[in-house]
Amino acid sequence: MKRFLPVVVAFVPAAVFLGARGPAAVPASDSKMATPRYDKTGALVRPEGFERWTFVGANIGMSYSQEAQAGPGEFHNIYTQPEAYAAYAATGRFPEKTMFLLVVHEPAQKVSINKSGYFEGPMKGLAVSVKDREHSPEGWAFYSFDEGAKLAATAKAMPTAMCFDCHAKHADDDHVFVQFHPILRQARPRSP
């Protein structure tokens, strides 16, 4: 978990929040959009089916630590709901209930016919950022489902100092690290 947290801080590639475009809420873009679910304690229930969501980017070995890594580092794949992506492409704003999922895989190599390079090995982590003013006064909250060798079914919001503050200060657009993901940069509406 400790190795993964610095990545979560940077992750939300898109992590979205109030941002340069102002704090006004954008309503959920579509009633069919998968929305965050919470248990009775307020913990986020781990989203399912995200593999069919819009893939917005990937990175390998991205870290916010000065420590050198051995090997290529972890693979990070980022997904959001198709409706949230479409709303961003149309308006430049992420709607309420937007979720970004950061899926972390260990690097693997030299399996089967592969003699060089790396590919995604076992999944080792999952982090989620959620834009939901009903559950987070700041607008966005970050959750880590890492629980040792398995993923937890629910997660409490992490303290704002762990992810939110960094996203608020460094994210390119609406608390999301759009700058790291060409798919989001290209989707952003351009002014005439």
Where on the chain are the PLM-derived regions?
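Short, polar loop/linker segments at the starts of domains and inter-domain junctions
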Residues: 65-75
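Short, structured beta-strand/loop micro-motifs enriched in basic residues and often containing a Trp
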Residues: 73-85
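Sequence context surrounding c-type heme c attachment/ligation sites in exported
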Residues: 27-30, 36-39, 46-54, 58-61, ...
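Ligand-binding pocket segment of bilobal, Venus flytrap-like solute-binding proteins
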Residues: 88
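Positively charged n-region of N-terminal signal peptides that target proteins for export
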Residues: 1-4
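Signal peptide processing junction and immediate N-terminal pro/mature segment
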Residues: 17-28
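Bacterial N-terminal signal peptides
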Residues: 8-19
